[in-house]
């Protein structure tokens, strides 16, 4: 049941089930609905959705809910193809079509220019990308030991827990080959990986950068030390796995912080640029 605020509005309560229609989206991909005058943010919802929503958090001016059941889907809703989308923190709009995503992003820009800039912009249509899959040319993978296994992927939403998702659809397929080879090599050669709590362990991140015009890939290992054990064997195997590799770089970062790259780099093999 709901209760009234001092202003006479109905206040939602935690675990309450309410019917809601999504009428807008926030810039972080949450659908927005209003029930009894209260704004509700609902992850993984789409404009036009009619939902049964379970309230999970109630604040003074707005609430958060989760989808209990989809009563009617909005036109922009699609079935996301990523198996870890709802756990990984890398994407926000995979549950809606690309066309719908562009509409909302254009609206975010226009709203900010009007509300924050005090402008009346003449908006031009967004030019869509010719590639919606495999377009990323850079990736930074935290490397951690989880359940006795060396794991590389992306951080879960609002956490530093690594989600094993080397096979992300937004990156080229050969990124996955490099990630899988690297984690397997570290595991088989008992090379330690970084632990954020203790500040100990060697390998912190795997950083990949691809030049589409040159078809070349730079591989960078970020380490909490001076050198990589078995570096020559790592490089030899890496070149066999991915022929696009043009350089292998070691980045030194001994700082106990969230900053990924340190200030010192050393090229282990290949081009310096």
Name each model feature, range by range:
Residues 2-273:
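Accessory RNA-recognition modules of RNA-modification enzymes
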């Amino acid at each position: 049941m709901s209760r009234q605020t001092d202003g006479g509005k109905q206040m939602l309560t935690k675990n309450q089930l309410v019917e809601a229609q999504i009428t807008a989206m926030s810039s972080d991909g949450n659908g927005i609905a209003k029930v009894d005058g209260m704004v509700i943010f609902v992850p993984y919802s789409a404009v036009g959705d009619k939902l049964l929503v379970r309230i999970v958090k109630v604040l003074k001016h707005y609430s958060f809910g989760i989808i209990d059941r989809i009563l009617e889907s909005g036109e922009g809703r699609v079935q996301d193809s990523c198996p870890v989308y709802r756990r990984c923190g890398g994407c926000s709009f995979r549950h809606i079509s690309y066309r719908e995503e562009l509409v909302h992003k254009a609206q975010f820009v226009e709203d900010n220019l009007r509300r924050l800039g005090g402008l009346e912009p003449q908006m031009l249509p967004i030019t869509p990308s010719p590639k919606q899959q495999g377009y990323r040319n850079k990736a930074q993978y935290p490397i951690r030991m989880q359940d006795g296994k060396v794991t590389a992927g992306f951080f879960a939403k609002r956490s530093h827990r690594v989600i094993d998702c080397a096979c992300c659809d937004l990156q080229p397929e050969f990124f996955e080959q490099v990630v899988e080879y690297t984690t397997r090599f570290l595991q088989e050669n008992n090379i330690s990986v970084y632990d954020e709590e203790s500040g100990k362990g060697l390998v912190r991140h795997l950083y990949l950068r691809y030049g589409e015009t040159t078809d070349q890939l730079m591989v960078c290992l970020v380490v909490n030390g001076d050198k990589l054990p078995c570096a020559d064997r790592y490089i030899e195997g890496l070149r066999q796995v991915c022929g696009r590799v043009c350089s292998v770089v070691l980045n030194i970062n001994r700082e106990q912080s969230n900053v990924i790259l340190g200030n010192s780099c050393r090229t282990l093999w290949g081009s310096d640029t």
